[in-house]
């Protein structure tokens, strides 16, 4: 049985994520930014407008978790 190096596994994983993101993100952004919020109440509309900011905060938290985990190794 062939043992795969951790670096190769990480490189393949990053490659797969980039390919999936390149295919799925344009459609997701199109659906999010073209959604009609005219019939929604003001509270839901406000949360919808904050969605990009909440996404950025989530990504930053993910990177902090990853960096702390990598620092412990």
From Swiss-Prot:
Region (Hydrophobic): 9-29, 47-67
UniProt subcellular location: Virion
Primary location recorded for the protein, binned into one broad class: virion
UniProt KW keywords: Lipoprotein, Virion
The record's account of how the chain is modified after translation: Probable lipoprotein. Lipid modification may enable hydrophobic interactions leading to the flexible nature of the virion. The protein probably exists in 2 forms, a lipid-modified one and an unmodified or less extensively modified one.
A single GO cellular-component term on record: virion component
Extra facts: The virion does not contain any lipid membrane.
Name the UniProt record assigns to this protein: Major capsid protein
């Amino acid at each position: 049985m062939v043992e795969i190096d951790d670096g190769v596994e990480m490189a393949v994983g990053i490659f797969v994520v980039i390919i999936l993101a390149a295919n799925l993100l344009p459609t997701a952004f199109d659906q999010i930014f073209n959604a009609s919020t005219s019939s929604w109440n003001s509270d839901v509309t406000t949360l919808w407008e904050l969605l990009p900011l909440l996404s950025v905060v989530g990504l930053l938290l993910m990177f902090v978790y990853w960096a702390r985990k990598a620092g412990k190794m």
